[in-house]
Amino acid sequence: MARVSREEVEHIANLSKLHISPEETTEMQDTLETILNFAQQIDTADTSSVEPTYHVLDLQNVLREDKAIPGIPQSLALKNAKETEDGQFKVPSIISGEDA
């Protein structure tokens, strides 16, 4: 049976940046002990004959074949641009200073 001291609860609360009252400390002490006892029960279960499961459902990825297809022509992509330069969109600079 797991025992959690008041000091451990206060330490956990401090690490979590929580301010808890003495009553809450007692309540959290009981809650943590219950959780740890349950975890110990699970730990004692005999799983030696159980095959490891990575997912509860038998799922497989369904992927399509990756095929390259032609995109739209550059002239069509740039057709409605306000400004272009050397076959590219030209936009106002948003970075100023030495790194620009």
Curated annotation (Swiss-Prot):
EC annotation from Swiss-Prot or TrEMBL: 6.3.5.-
Source taxon at top rank: Bacteria
GO MF annotation: an example: glutaminyl-tRNA synthase (glutamine-hydrolyzing) activity
Keyword Transferase annotated: no
Disulfide bonds: none
Alphabetized NCBIfam families for the sequence: gatC
Function field: Allows the formation of correctly charged Asn-tRNA(Asn) or Gln-tRNA(Gln) through the transamidation of misacylated Asp-tRNA(Asn) or Glu-tRNA(Gln) in organisms which lack either or both of asparaginyl-tRNA or glutaminyl-tRNA synthetases. The reaction takes place in the presence of glutamine and ATP through an activated phospho-Asp-tRNA(Asn) or phospho-Glu-tRNA(Gln).
Protein's name according to its UniProt entry: Aspartyl/glutamyl-tRNA(Asn/Gln) amidotransferase subunit C
Organism, scientific name: Staphylococcus carnosus (strain TM300)
Lineage of producing organism: Bacteria, Bacillati, Bacillota, Bacilli, Bacillales
